[in-house]
């Protein structure tokens, strides 16, 4: 309840109802509710409880020294939870001359981001004369942590699946940084790679820092792709084996290390483009499906 005064001795009570979005993280949130009545103004501190931590879940392995702060197991509903994710949409080539049109979950009656039996399927499909697909991002962002996803990659020349990160406060590429945890292109099947991009190191000038490995079952079995990101280094892993490492040169120069700000996670399946379509595309591979079992985020205790 809130009370306001209207003249001498006149006090009126009003009930105020505040609606907020669910807290999908494992950390409480602090905020304020400001109540105004005429010239009167009251600020009320509020705390939103954290989501209960599933620390007792035997299926979640927590890296030593870390704690779970966010996860998506894709075990509820038939489409991604829009309290945790949002779609990027459009057909502008995305700076890579990609051929697909990204949509918000569906194209007409076709469901292109579908959850079934605990698996999210991102589907690239030709409908009419256009290939449609999905690009989705977490609403949360994090500075440092251990990030992992269990993925099965699509088949076919022209496919370009990715699991990556971009800065929350993005102004320019590559100055603000990019972290590619996992990428693969269909014409080079089962070769998975990781990379970072920044002003000093990026593919446009041939200086990108990258690592690659051959994973013969990348398109037929699920594998765990992970990133450990600290103030000192960026490391990626496939099934616990290190794939790539990039160290902070400690020069205090964002041209070589812009990775000291919050980044958010991205999942997408591109079709064609400068890399994905470098050897052409094979439309007989469509529809192509990129499968995601889970996405988890851990931060140091």
Where are these regions (language model features)?
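Short, surface-exposed loop/turn segments at beta-strand-coil junctions that are enriched for proline
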Residues: 21-27
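GH16 jelly-roll
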Residues: 52-301
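Single conserved hydrophobic/aromatic residue that forms the stacking wall/gate
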Residues: 1-12
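Interdomain boundary/hinge segments at the C-termini of tandem beta-sandwich modules
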Residues: 46-52
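A short beta-strand micro-motif common to beta-rich folds, especially ectodomain repeats
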Residues: 27-38
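Strand-loop-strand motifs at the edges of beta-sheets in extracellular beta-sandwich domains
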Residues: 13-21
């Amino acid at each position: 309840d809130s009370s306001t005064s209207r003249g001498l001795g006149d006090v009126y009570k009003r009930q105020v109802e505040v609606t907020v979005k669910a807290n999908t993280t494992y950390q409480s949130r602090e905020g304020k509710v400001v109540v105004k009545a005429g010239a009167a103004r009251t600020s009320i501190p509020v705390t939103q409880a954290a989501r209960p931590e599933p620390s007792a879940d035997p299926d979640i392995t927590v890296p030593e020294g870390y704690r779970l702060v966010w996860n998506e197991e894709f075990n509820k509903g038939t489409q991604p939870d829009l309290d945790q994710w949002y779609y990027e949409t459009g057909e502008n080539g995305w700076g890579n001359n990609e051929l697909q049109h990204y949509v918000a979950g569906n194209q007409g009656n076709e469901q292109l981001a579908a959850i079934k039996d605990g698996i999210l399927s991102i589907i690239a499909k030709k409908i009419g004369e256009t290939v449609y697909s999905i690009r989705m991002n977490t609403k949360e962002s994090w500075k440092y942590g251990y990030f992992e996803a269990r993925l099965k990659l699509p088949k076919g020349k022209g496919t370009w699946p990715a699991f990556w990160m971009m800065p929350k406060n993005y102004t320019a590429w590559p100055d603000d940084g990019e972290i590619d945890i996992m990428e693969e292109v269909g014409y080079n099947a089962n070769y998975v790679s990781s990379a970072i991009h920044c002003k000093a190191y990026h593919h446009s000038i041939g200086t990108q820092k990258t690592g690659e490995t051959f994973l013969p079952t990348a398109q037929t079995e699920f594998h765990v792709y992970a990133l450990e990101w600290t103030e000192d280094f960026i490391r990626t892993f496939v099934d616990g084996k290190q794939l790539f490492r990039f160290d902070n040169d400690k020069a205090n120069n964002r041209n070589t290390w812009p990775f000291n700000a919050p980044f958010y996670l991205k999942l997408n399946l591109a079709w064609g483009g400068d890399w994905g379509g470098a050897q052409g595309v094979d439309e007989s591979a469509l529809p192509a499906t990129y499968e995601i079992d889970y996405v988890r985020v851990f931060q140091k205790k």
